């Protein structure tokens, strides 16, 4: 698959992204590398913790394939710092409190929470090529086996 599966607004690549550890980056700063961006609802919740740990366990394989990983939620940098320290994540988490990145990737969805309709992050992952094209998207992600599936897709795309 070489065609983009999601067209991102050009401005998305220059959005300032606040990372765990207090640094900033942009998507453009990752040009030339494969990039896995996974969106998750909330730090330190069971599913989000498992997903992060699964990506972290496979980080050497993602590195070997030339990919960087960014996890994204609406939590604060401080929350991300605590989450990373507690779980030992070796990749950065993006604090998207203003939802700019979430909206660019269209992951803010209406969800049913305790009988009420609320807007929240739909667990989603996107694989960006070194040229910045979204070449694969996973929406409504089920955590079990997901990081393995993303790694397999990365390897398949990298061979093309």
Swiss-Prot record:
Catalytic residues, chain numbering: 48 (cysteine sulfenic acid (-soh) intermediate)
Disulfide bonds: 48-84
Catalytic activity: a hydroperoxide + [thioredoxin]-dithiol = an alcohol + [thioredoxin]-disulfide + H2O
InterPro entries for the chain: AhpC/TSA, Peroxiredoxin_BCP/PrxQ, Thioredoxin-like_sf, Thioredoxin_domain
Molecular function via GO: thioredoxin peroxidase activity
Major enzyme class: oxidoreductase
Keywords in alphabetical order: Antioxidant, Disulfide bond, Oxidoreductase, Peroxidase, Redox-active center
EC number: 1.11.1.24
CDD domains from the UniProt entry: PRX_BCP (cd03017)
Highest taxon in the source lineage: Bacteria
Domain Thioredoxin, residue spans: 4-159
Gene Ontology CC annotations of this record: cytoplasm
Protein family membership: Belongs to the peroxiredoxin family. BCP/PrxQ subfamily.
Misc remark: The active site is a conserved redox-active cysteine residue, the peroxidatic cysteine (C(P)), which makes the nucleophilic attack on the peroxide substrate. The peroxide oxidizes the C(P)-SH to cysteine sulfenic acid (C(P)-SOH), which then reacts with another cysteine residue, the resolving cysteine (C(R)), to form a disulfide bridge. The disulfide is subsequently reduced by an appropriate electron donor to complete the catalytic cycle. In this atypical 2-Cys peroxiredoxin, C(R) is present in the same subunit to form an intramolecular disulfide.
Cross-referenced PANTHER family: AHPC_TSA FAMILY PROTEIN, THIOREDOXIN-DEPENDENT PEROXIDE REDUCTASE
Subunit structure of this chain's protein: Monomer.
Name of this protein: Peroxiredoxin Bcp
Organism: Xanthomonas campestris pv. campestris (strain ATCC 33913 / DSM 3586 / NCPPB 528 / LMG 568 / P 25)
UniProt lineage: Bacteria, Pseudomonadati, Pseudomonadota, Gammaproteobacteria, Lysobacterales
């Amino acid at each position: 698959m070489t065609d983009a599966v999601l067209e991102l607004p050009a401005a998305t690549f220059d959005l300032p992204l606040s990372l765990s550890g207090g640094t900033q980056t942009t998507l453009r700063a990752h040009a030339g590398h494969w990039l896995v961006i996974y969106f998750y609802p909330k730090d330190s919740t069971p599913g989000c913790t498992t997903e992060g740990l699964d990506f972290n366990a496979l980080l050497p394989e993602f590195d070997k394939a030339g990919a960087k990983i960014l996890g994204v939620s609406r939590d604060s940098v401080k929350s991300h710092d605590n989450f990373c320290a507690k779980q030992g994540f070796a990749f950065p988490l993006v604090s998207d409190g203003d939802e700019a990145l979430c909206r660019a990737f269209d992951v803010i969805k209406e969800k049913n929470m305790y009988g009420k309709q609320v807007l929240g992050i739909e667990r989603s992952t996107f694989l960006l090529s070194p040229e910045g094209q979204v070449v694969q998207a996973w929406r409504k992600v089920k955590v079990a086996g997901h990081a393995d599936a993303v790694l397999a897709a990365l390897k398949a795309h990298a061979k093309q």
